[in-house]
């Protein structure tokens, strides 16, 4: 049939991770050898995926051995703000979003990108046209405290946004870790707004200066930018306060946090 009939209407990235078996280890050539064996064992599958990446628009394949899908998305795929031409040819900027097929898709929330995990069928329904298919305190300590606090508060099925002056103390890695744990505290996602730390990480991971400038300008203009001044905070349905300074070394255990 005609592949264009089911061409994705939004960009789709298929990241092949958790696939390379460890046949060789402890040698300089171990990685290359393991990836080579992976291709040999699954050649027919990879040939099909290669065809798909050429047959469809808006579809790309990230090969095995590249990294875990959430980290690949964080470092290489996500832009925070996208731009494209509308029907008149004018360039339009719009916020990046991500619908993933894994519960820890929420990791990308740490970059200011709204994203969460759904089932495979639900993801297909989202992109196929016409609904053809239905000091001494670590980031871990903070995460455990956040998880415990949000579990007690009750955020199942909620969108949680982190805000306030304490965010400037959190690196992108810290934010991504907290966002990644959204399934553990029960929220649909744990979102971090775009701010200077977002821009620094985009620059660190090789995003273009043009994309970074667009992200900042768009976020400020549309009200997505995070300010330290509390007078500029959004009005939320419910709020929960956590003083980062009160976080102590923590240890997780059965049912705790």
Per-range role (PLM):
Residues 1-257:
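Fe-S-dependent hydro-lyases/dehydratases of central metabolism
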């Amino acid at each position: 049939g005609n592949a264009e009939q089911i061409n994705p209407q939004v960009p789709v990235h298929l990241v092949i991770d958790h696939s390379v078996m460890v046949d060789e280890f402890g040698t300089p050539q171990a990685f290359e050898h393991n990836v080579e064996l992976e291709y040999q064992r699954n050649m027919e599958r990879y040939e099909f995926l290669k065809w798909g990446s050429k047959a469809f628009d808006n579809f790309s394949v990230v090969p095995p051995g590249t990294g875990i899908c959430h980290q690949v998305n964080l470092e290489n795929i996500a832009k925070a703000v996208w731009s494209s031409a509308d029907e008149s040819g004018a360039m339009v900027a719009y916020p990046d979003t991500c619908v993933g097929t894994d519960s820890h898709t929420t990791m990308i929330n740490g970059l200011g990108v709204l994203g969460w995990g759904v089932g495979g069928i639900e993801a297909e329904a989202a992109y196929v046209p016409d609904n053809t298919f239905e000091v001494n305190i670590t980031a871990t300590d903070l995460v455990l405290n956040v998880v415990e606090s949000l579990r007690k508060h009750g955020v199942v099925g909620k969108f949680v946004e982190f805000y306030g002056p304490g965010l400037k103390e959190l690196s992108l890695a810290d934010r991504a870790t907290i966002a990644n744990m959204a399934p553990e505290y029960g929220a649909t996602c744990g979102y971090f707004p775009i701010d200077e730390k977002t821009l620094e990480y985009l620059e660190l991971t090789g995003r273009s200066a043009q994309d970074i400038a667009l992200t900042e300008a768009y976020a400020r203009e549309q009200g997505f930018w995070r300010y330290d001044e509390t007078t500029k905070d959004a009005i939320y349905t419910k709020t929960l306060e956590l003083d980062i300074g009160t976080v102590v070394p923590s240890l997780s255990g059965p049912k705790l946090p």
